[in-house]
């Protein structure tokens, strides 16, 4: 964690934390960034086929990393963009109380560099509370909270994946197509889109990259089909 913090803190860091979804969200951000013009460095927790692994050495200013909150080591990070997918009562062996978990994420957001932002999922009650209390600028996303800046509406599921209508600040932007299934991946993709836009990546580069994203290894990974059963 010390080496990762050293790399991220001397760059335009993008750090993804949360009880669930951080590996897939960081993988989505990584694939979008790698397909864009910004040439990022990537250090994440899951292997991604299109990246050829879980790391990439880029020449650009951005470093995308997964921030592990389980032992508090994510507080060593001072990112430009801090993404939090959710906060739950997890890792109690380290934190000891619900309040300590919340305080750790409060500190994580306070570490965001000037000119950066916290990108938070408003479907998490604790993140809604944190968004109202932090002095760090917030970019919000979600399915259930009407005040979220990035929203997915009219979600359609099929055997081929998922698609939805993307709204930003209440305005329809585009239809998003994913080949990874499930509502959780709709949320993950919203966080990735919000982050990529904050990084300056145009939507015409974001959406094609997301459409090709096939998931991170060991995250609802398709292994085969036998007698019609996947």
Per-region residue spans from a language model:
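Phosphate-binding loop of NTP-binding sites
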Residues: 1-122, 126-136, 190, 194-199, ...
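Adenine nucleotide phosphate-binding catalytic loops in nucleotide-utilizing enzymes
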Residues: 95-102, 116, 132, 136-230
